[in-house]
Amino acid sequence: MVEMAQGNIPFFEKNLKEIIRRNVRAGRLVYSTDIESFARKAQVIFLAEDSADHLSDVVMRISRLAPTPPILTIVTPVSVGTASALEKSLKDAGLQATIVSQPMFFTDGCAVEDFNWPDRLILGSTSNEAVHILKQIFHPLVMRGVPVIVTNQATAELVRESATAFVATKISFINEVSALCERVGADAVSLALALGLDKKIAPRCLQPGAGMGGVFAESDMDSLAQLAQANGVSLKVLSAARDVNHSLADRLLDKIALALDSVENKDVGILGLAFKPNTNSVAGSSAVSLAQSLVAKGARVRAYDPVALSDAKNRLNGSVRYCDSAYSAAEGMDALVVGTGWPEFRALDFDRIKHLLKKPIIVDTKNLLDSSRLRAMGFEYVGVGRG
């Protein structure tokens, strides 16, 4: 808590450290482990506990301490039925509180922007009073025209998981079609642009080579799949999307193996290990899975990432050599792989990169770089979905 109060958050999130420090200094943000003081003073308490057991304990404890029935708003991902189960536990214990499901849709690396400019606010509650108070709290967003969806708790809980599954389906679709592009001489990047301009489709999450990662992505889809199975519903599209997402690293490995004839006893540098730019999270990262696959096939791997090396080390267990710059990751390598679409990689000195590599081969799994420029410089450039 002391570290957090100083703005030293244990993860990387663009602009968040500065916001925390500014608001702590202004007295608007206080960190404390004294749950009793909050329970006795606050009318509305937002619960960001990520463990179902802990969430239940916190709800019961606050409800016992609060002088009047509090409004307890759950903002972290929870399985469908959580709010209903909490209400039953409260009733059985003779306690009172209003439980609201308000799923937040924060994207790693864009959380501050997502909070300030959300696509919508979801309020899952049958209490008109709770809805009115929450609309007052989020008045600046409401006045800005952010849509507010008021629904029951189960629907609010299901929105989060369904949104994750839909995005996974969209990502998996463009990755499947990008494989077809490679066979027929089409360009998946241009195809994705054309598809995204269709108002029925929209451009976000249509980047060939992108995977479905993040801390909650797998758990959201697991929870939705389990809910469907428990209720006798077959979610075939979700199952197929997950299969495609899980196979992405194998497809990328095949690209590298084809460019090098084989990856065994080859030296491969990877630029980027985070699952996406502007985050240190490697949860569900296709780049980390690719590094593991390369090592398993006998390759020697070096890697560089601006912020995710610490998290990656916990996943890769010493099987990869970590570098302090992109140039160190390229030196003496048979191929250089772009694993994460960090914008700074576009600004690298590719003349220098070319002289550092044993072979001027770049496998760009995110289609981040200027392929025409690199080929003109003498690189063998391999992208995703670019026939």
Model-derived segments and their meaning:
Residues 1-387:
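Structural/interface elements that position substrates and couple domains in central-metabolism enzymes
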